[in-house]
């Protein structure tokens, strides 16, 4: 991308605003090196990435990027053996914490169902160095000092230092409080010179205290003396301080070596958080300028809906719809100067540059933009004083360069094409230049005030006229772009509003050809038609938005209704299942009683006992089952029944075997130890195939129930989860399952570790592994059973 294009389209000013939203020098460095890309896939990915960060901001308000600094030079110094200072080590620890915190932040959102595939990939590259981080913070305090607890030796040395300092101060303070002190001392204070404790002694009493003179006042009347009685104590103190310094250096070297070992990982983490800072800066900037994600196409057309210039206050600027590349490849904006034509031109250019840089652009949703390999712009008066070039010559030098390089993958922006020379020749040149660029397939937006170019838009298939609306009543441009309507000067209307007499204006009209007057009148009618059409469109758009709002409200109500309905159905189902479970338990109790009767050698159970047992079985079934109508389609009459056939007795939900037919509609059926008469309408023939696949059903205490092939533990407390795993594995073994899956999610990893620790000890487990990509990855453990 040409540097001149970036400059005239004020790309660097956008970058300056973007810089304000970075959280660290790492992100700022990324912004400073930002340039538009020309790779379609890269641009799409950058836009998607910015959109994910914008989603995070919408949901959370911010991202935890605090505490991150550029530690790359410090890490590289550690790598070559230089000792790092406490503050440098603390910066490394803080940055490691910041990267770890950012990783956890994104992963927590993903675990809660927020789809962030690109950001999730970014944070997956961050490697936690918690142990190193804690070693540093355990040794270095928040103020950058090495703390006493950094080592036992350092704690002992500092205890010695504090003891020595206390003894020295005590002796010196006794001296300053003595009866002669006021006479011999300049002041009753204890101070420090050359890291040794001293007292201020008057010049004439220097020999009283003995010791060493370390300093004197500016007047020479006061000497700062270390009295002889504390010289040994001060010496001991200095020795302890030397030991302290040596121990601190040892600790810092040890920590520096730890950093050097993990240097490559630390630098990799820094690169990831630098990218994250950069990504979120783009998202915050999008929020600031009310920008949206454009649809990026490779079809060489753009559709900017309600586009605004990002550097102009959104409350002031008038948004415009700008389309280019489908029905027409060139827009020629005509009309007088100071009408906002240049702003429109720059809006197109800066939106393209921003989109190709991965920035969201200030447009409405569903706007589309394409990728250009080159963007050329000839905007403004950039004549060169050094080269003694006129305005026209300066523009022409730039245009010649554009004509040499422009092709079908280029966007070309011309401001006041052909200006600065004779109007007739300038207009002719402008037409010729536009033809040349259009023939090369480039997309072109050009502004001009030459009336000759109004006809140009009608004489070329791929060219359309446009103008910026002017309000004659207020004598000011509205900055509203009118596609399909050429501009007009409005000179007569403006002059009339300013007080010029009608006579002079009428005479002026006579100097203009009839054809020109007709064209001006036609343009005025086009403007009026455009306004009416736009007003109708705005009304239709308002109705559409109102309909969408109503539709969303109805959808919300339907969803709420369905949720309430489902909740009630689930509740009713749960209650029904509880009743059925209670009935099954009651039935098991009855069967157990009958078995006990049989064990008591009462082989012939009396009729009244059977009747009583049968009625109790029927009474144990809940009302839900009793009232259920038998489905005639599945009943036995469709199958020719024979003695020995296996059937299901629908009333009890139990299997039985046909003994003999006792009437046209009844059979004698053996159900366990019971023998009873059952109507054919209450039976269902069981067709047992020769080879049957193993069903996911286990039988426990005469009870059939379904065992799932997977166990979902997400959201469970650790203790409850372990209890469920134990029961589930037992049930799965009873069901003869060869393989099952346990879903524990990714999260912090505690539940996953707990599950796998348990599996290692379980006798029924053959092997286990993480799930493959299609099975749930690290969030699932697949278990092979013996």
Swiss-Prot record:
Residues 711-786 form the Smr domain. It holds the Pfam family MSSS. InterPro entries: DNA_mismatch_repair_MutS_C, DNA_mismatch_repair_MutS_core, DNA_mismatch_repair_MutS_sf, MSSS, MutS, MutS2, P-loop_NTPase, Smr_dom. One of its GO terms (molecular function) is endonuclease activity. Its EC number is 3.1.-.-, 3.6.4.-. One of its GO terms (biological process) is mismatch repair. Homodimer. Binds to stalled ribosomes, contacting rRNA. PANTHER family: OS10G0509000 PROTEIN, OS10G0509000 PROTEIN-RELATED. Belongs to the DNA mismatch repair MutS family. MutS2 subfamily. This is Endonuclease MutS2. It comes from Bacillus anthracis. The gene is mutS2.
């Amino acid at each position: 991308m040409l540097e001149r294009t970036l400059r005239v389209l004020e790309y660097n000013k956008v970058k300056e605003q973007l810089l304000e939203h970075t959280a660290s020098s790492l992100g700022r460095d990324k912004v400073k090196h930002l340039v538009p890309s020309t790779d379609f896939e890269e641009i799409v990915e950058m836009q998607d990435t910015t959109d994910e960060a914008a989603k995070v901001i919408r949901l959370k308000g911010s991202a935890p990027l605090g505490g991150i600094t550029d530690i790359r030079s410090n890490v590289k110094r550690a790598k070559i053996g230089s000792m790092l200072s406490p503050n440098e080590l603390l910066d490394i620890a803080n940055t490691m914490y910041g990267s770890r915190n950012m990783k956890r932040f994104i992963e927590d959102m993903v675990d809660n169902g927020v789809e962030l595939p690109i950001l999730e990939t970014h944070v997956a590259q961050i490697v936690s160095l918690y142990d190193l981080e804690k070693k540093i913070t355990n040794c270095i305090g928040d103020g950058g000092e090495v703390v006493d607890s950094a080592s036992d030796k350092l704690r002992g040395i500092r205890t010695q230092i504090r003891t020595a300092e206390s003894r020295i101060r005590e002796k010196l303070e006794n001296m300053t409080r003595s009866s002669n002190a006021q006479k011999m001392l300049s002041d009753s204070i204890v101070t420090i010179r050359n890291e040794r404790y001293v007292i201020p002694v008057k010049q004439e009493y220097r020999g009283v205290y003995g010791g060493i003179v370390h300093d004197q006042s500016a007047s020479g009347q006061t000497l700062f003396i270390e009295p002889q009685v504390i010289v040994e104590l001060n010496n001991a103190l200095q020795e302890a301080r030397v030991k302290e310094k040596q121990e601190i250096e040892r600790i810092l070297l040890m920590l520096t070596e730890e950093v050097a070992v993990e240097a490559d990982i630390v630098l990799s983490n820094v690169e990831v958080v630098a990218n994250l800072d950069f990504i979120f800066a783009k998202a915050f900037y999008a929020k600031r300028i009310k920008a949206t994600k454009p649809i990026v196409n490779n079809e060489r057309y753009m559709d900017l809906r309600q586009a605004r210039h990002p550097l102009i206050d959104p409350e002031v600027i008038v948004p415009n719809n700008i389309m280019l590349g489908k029905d027409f490849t060139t827009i020629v904006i005509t009309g007088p100067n100071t009408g906002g034509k240049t702003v429109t031109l720059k809006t197109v250019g800066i939106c393209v540059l921003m989109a190709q840089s991965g920035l969201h652009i200030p447009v409405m949703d569903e706007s589309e933009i394409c990728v250009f390999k080159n963007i050329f712009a000839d905007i403004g008066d950039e004549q060169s004083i050094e080269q003694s070039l006129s305005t026209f010559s300066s523009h022409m030098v730039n245009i010649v360069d554009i004509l040499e390089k422009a092709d079908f993958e280029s966007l070309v922006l011309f401001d006041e094409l052909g200006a600065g020379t004779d109007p007739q020749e300038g207009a002719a040149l402008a037409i010729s230049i536009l033809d040349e660029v259009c023939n090369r397939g480039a997309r072109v937006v050009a502004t001009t005030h030459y009336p000759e170019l109004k006809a140009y838009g009608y004489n070329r298939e791929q060219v359309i006229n446009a103008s910026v609306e002017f309000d004659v009543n207020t004598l000011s441009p509205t900055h509203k772009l009118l596609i399909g309507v050429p501009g007009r000067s409005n000179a007569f209307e403006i002059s009339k509003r300013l007080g010029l007499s009608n006579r002079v204006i009428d005479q002026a009209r006579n100097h203009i050809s009839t054809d020109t007057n007709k064209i001006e009148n036609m343009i005025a009618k086009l403007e009026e038609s455009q306004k009416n059409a736009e007003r109708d469109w705005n009304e239709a758009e308002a109705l559409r938005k109102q309909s969408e709002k109503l539709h969303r409200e109805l959808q919300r109500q339907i969803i709420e209704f369905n949720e309430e309905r489902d909740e009630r159905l689930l509740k009713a189902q749960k209650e029904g299942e509880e009743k059925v479970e209670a009935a099954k338990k009651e039935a098991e109790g009855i069967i157990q009683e009958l078995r006990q009767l049989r064990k008591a050698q009462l082989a012939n159970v009396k009729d009244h006992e059977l009747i009583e047992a049968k009625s109790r079985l029927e009474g144990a079934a809940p009302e839900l089952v009793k009232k259920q109508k038998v489905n005639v389609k599945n009943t036995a009459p469709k199958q020719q029944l024979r003695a020995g056939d296996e059937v299901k007795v629908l009333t009890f939900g139990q299997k039985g075997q046909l003994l003999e037919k006792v009437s046209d509609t009844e059979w004698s059926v053996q159900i366990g130890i019971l023998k009873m008469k059952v109507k054919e309408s209450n039976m269902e023939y069981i067709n047992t195939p020769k080879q049957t696949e193993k069903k996911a059903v286990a039988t426990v205490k005469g009870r059939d129930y379904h065992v799932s092939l997977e166990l979902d533990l997400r959201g469970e407390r650790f203790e409850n989860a372990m209890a469920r795993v134990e029961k589930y594995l037992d049930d799965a073994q009873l069901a003869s399952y060869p393989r099952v899956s346990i879903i524990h999610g990714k999260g912090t990893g505690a539940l996953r570790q707990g599950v796998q620790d348990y599996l290692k000890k379980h006798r029924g487990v053959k092997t286990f592994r993480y799930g493959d990509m299609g099975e749930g990855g690290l969030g699932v453990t697949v278990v092979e059973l013996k």
